[in-house]
Amino acid sequence: MATGKIVQVIGAVVDVEFPQDAVPRVYDALEVQNGNEKLVLEVQQQLGGGIVRTIAMGSSDGLSRGLDVKDLEHPIEVPVGKATLGRIMNVLGEPVDMKGEIGEEERWAIHRAAPSYEELSNSQELLETGIKVIDLMCPFAKGGKVGLFGGAGVGKTVNMMELIRNIAIEHSGYSVFAGVGERTREGNDFYHEMTDSNVIDKVSLVYGQMNEPPGNRLRVALTGLTMAEKFRDEGRDVLLFVDNIYRYTLAGTEVSALLGRMPSAVGYQPTLAEEMGVLQERITSTKTGSITSVQAVYVPADDLTDPSPATTFAHLDATVVLSRQIASLGIYPAVDPLDSTSRQLDPLVVGQEHYDTARGVQSILQRYQELKDIIAILGMDELSEEDKLVVARARKIQRFLSQPFFVAEVFTGSPGKYVSLKDTIRGFKGIMEGEYDHLPEQAFYMVGSIDEAVEKAKKL
C-alpha cells in the first residue's frame, strides 16, 4: 500500500505526490488522517511527476501540506445488500443515523461498467401510480426511467414523495433513495414519512445534501445506484429515486472548474453529456431484475432548453413536466398535460381506450389554449355554441386533473386519494362525452375519482 504526501490544497481539490513507481490509478480512493477524522480523496487526474489531483469527499478544513496519504488501491466501496435497508448512509456508505454499524456482508465499488447490450431487457408492463394525470397522460413503464421536470417551488419533491408513498406501499419491493444536493430538512421529513408509513425497512437512504463539498454530491448518486444494482442483480424489481439529478450535474460543473477544465455552454463542464451517460446507462433493467427510476430534474429559470435538463431528456422513457402557470391556478399536481410525454402512450401498450382518452383530453385542452386569446379580447359570448362546450369541458378536465396527495395532508387538510387507472379513464371519458356537462366545474377540483365529483356537486 503506497504512501504519498499532500503538496497542495485548493478548496476541495487536493494534490498528492507519490513515488513515481506507485502512482494511484484514476478513481482510486486515497485516505488521509485529518485530525480525528479520516478523509477520503478520489483521484481525478494524473499530472505527471508522481503527482495526482484528487477531489475530497468531505470537508478539507484542517488539511495541510506534508500530511501522509494512503493509497487504498481500489475505488470507493460501499455496503450493498439487505443490511442497507432502513439505514441512512453518506457517500462512503457510512451510517449517519446513529444506529451502529451497517454489518454488511459485501461491499461494491461505486464505479462499475453498465450492463452489456445482451443483458438488457425490454418491459412493456405499466406501473400504476394512483396519480390521475400521470397514469393518463404519461404512464410509467416497469423498469423504465422517469424524469420530473420543474423550476423552483412547483412541487418536484412533493410529487416524488407521493410517488414513493404510492409505489413503495402498493409495490412490495425494495427502494433506494439518493438525495443529491437537496435540503437536509426534506431528507429528514422523508425519513419520518417512511417510518410513519412502515416502509422504512424496505428503503435504503443515501444522502449527500446541499452543505456537502462538490466531490460528495458528484458521487452520492453513484453510491445509491450501486446499492440498487445489487438488488437488481439478485433478481428483484427495485425502485431508484434520485432527488435531484440537476445537483449531480452542478457538482460536476464545480469539480470540472476546480480541476481547471475549460467550461462549455452556459458554464457547464465540457464532459456534461458523458457524465450524464455514465450515470444513466447504469440505471437500466436486465434479464435478471429491473430498476425503475424516478428522477427529479430542477429546471434553471424554467428554461427546458438549458443544457442540463436538455441532456437529461434524451435518457428518459417518460417526462413529467411541472408548470408554474398551472401551479398559479392552484391546480396540484401542477403537471402540464400538453408538455408531458411517455413512450408507453401507445395503443399497443396501454390499449386503444386509454390512448384515445389521453389524446382526446389533449386535443380539448389544446383547443382551449387557442380559444383563450379570443376569450380575453372578445369575451365568452362571441364563441360558437360548439366552442363554448369545448371551453366548459376543458375547464372541468383541467380541474379534474388536480388531486389531493397523501404526503400533503398536513398542509391541505384534505385526505389523500389513490385513483386506479380504470377509474381515471372512466372519469375523463365521461367528461369528454358530455355525461357531466350539468355539473359545476368546482365539483371537479381536488377530488379523487369521478364519483367523488358527483357527490361533491350535490353539496354545492
Curated annotation (Swiss-Prot):
Catalytic activity: ATP + H2O + 4 H(+)(in) = ADP + phosphate + 5 H(+)(out)
Record's bilayer topology term: Peripheral membrane protein
Cellular-component GO terms for this entry: plasma membrane; proton-transporting ATP synthase complex
Keywords of this entry: ATP synthesis, ATP-binding, Cell inner membrane, Cell membrane, CF(1), Hydrogen ion transport, Ion transport, Membrane, Nucleotide-binding, Translocase, Transport
SMART domains: AAA
EC class (word): translocase
Subunit-level organization: F-type ATPases have 2 components, CF(1) - the catalytic core - and CF(0) - the membrane proton channel. CF(1) has five subunits: alpha(3), beta(3), gamma(1), delta(1), epsilon(1). CF(0) has three main subunits: a(1), b(2) and c(9-12). The alpha and beta chains form an alternating ring which encloses part of the gamma chain. CF(1) is attached to CF(0) by a central stalk formed by the gamma and epsilon chains, while a peripheral stalk is formed by the delta and b chains.
Function (record text): Produces ATP from ADP in the presence of a proton gradient across the membrane. The catalytic sites are hosted primarily by the beta subunits.
The protein, known as: ATP synthase subunit beta
Source organism phylogeny: Bacteria, Pseudomonadati, Pseudomonadota, Gammaproteobacteria, Enterobacterales
